[in-house]
Amino acid sequence: MNLPVSLACLLLSGCVFFLGVFVSSSLYARKKRAFLEKIQKLEHENQLLQTSLNLSRHQEQLIEDFSNRLALSSHKLIKDMKEEAQNYFGDTSKSFQSILSPIQTTLTTFKQSLETFETKHAEDRGRLKEQISQLLAVEKKLEHETHVLTDILKHPGSRGRWGEIQLERILELAGMLKYCDYDSQTTSAQGAFRADIIIRLPQDRCLIIDAKAPISDSYFSVEEIDKGDLVDKIKEHIKTLKSKSYWEKFHQSPEYVILFLPGESLFNDAIRLAPELMEIGASSNVILSSPLTLLALLKTIAYMWKQENLQKQIQEVSLLGKELHRRLQVVFTHFQKIGKNLNQTVQSYNDMTSSFQYRVLPTLRKFEGLETSSSHQIEEPTPIESLATSFPHTCDIDTNLAVIESLEKQD
């Protein structure tokens, strides 16, 4: 496909070049024909003059002069025509070169772009093939891990541990840190009950989360899925959590417990089979939660902590503002003292200058008129006219602090 395009461009360039040469040749032939006509006309006139010279010897010199001038004019005309033709063909050649040069450059650029595209396309095909191979390998690995996970979840102990791991992953996604934002496997003060996760809330409060994976062997059955026992296990666990009454053992907790189901499919299947589960759980102070709803709740708690920290920072800024205000009051007082001292110093300097000008300087001028003085003349001191700028008013610290405290009470 590239070769026909290149040949077409080259044929087009050749046609343009030969068309220009043909036009130039036509113009040159036309000028040559006009030149020959002029030569013939001049030769005819020359014949007439020769005939006239034969009739009159008196005009021989004139005819000779005219012939010489005619020869010179013809030579000059031929020379001018030759130079004009050379210049014209030279300009035409340059013009064609300027026309063909961009075309050649465009063809070269197009060829380079095409080669680059083919190289890149080959590289992309290689990378795509490699990625497809990796994807197939990952798919096989995922299929193997799915079978392994299915075998593991058939054991009750593994199912419980899987639920706890899923809960910890949700906590990590929410940006919470263990022992900082939450505690795991915390025992109550009486030591009788142990909560899976306790989330710390602002104002020394907490939220209790219990992870449950109510999965039976029939849940993984491929031939005939019977998920009726899923609802029974969830109802049984709701009764267990109600009997434990975590909110009474952990006094800073709200009067409910979050029952975390570690899978959107578990939550959806349970609600689809028994929509009354939400109402049953709420009446028992147990809130059912899927991974997504729990993540949204944890994000909300993180936002509450952010607002709590922001409020503490605002209070700290308020205290720092009060302290800064007191310290600035002291600084402003020192500034005022410095200004007063500067003004007193300037006033004393001006008084000394005035005394020197009117009492001491006249006597010194008399000394300068005598031979006993030196050749140097004592310069007259210049008084200072500007004074130190004072603050427009004194900062009333008690009034300003009272205003700040009143605004804080309103907030």
From Swiss-Prot:
In terms of domain of life, where is this protein from?
Bacteria
BP GO terms, sorted: DNA recombination
Xref: InterPro entries? DNA_recombination_RmuC (IPR003798)
Q: Which UniProt keywords apply?
A: Coiled coil, DNA recombination
Give coiled-coil spans as residue ranges: 26-64, 123-143
Say what the protein does: Involved in DNA recombination.
Family, according to the entry, reads as follows:
Belongs to the RmuC family.
- Which protein is depicted? DNA recombination protein RmuC homolog
Gene that this sequence comes from: rmuC
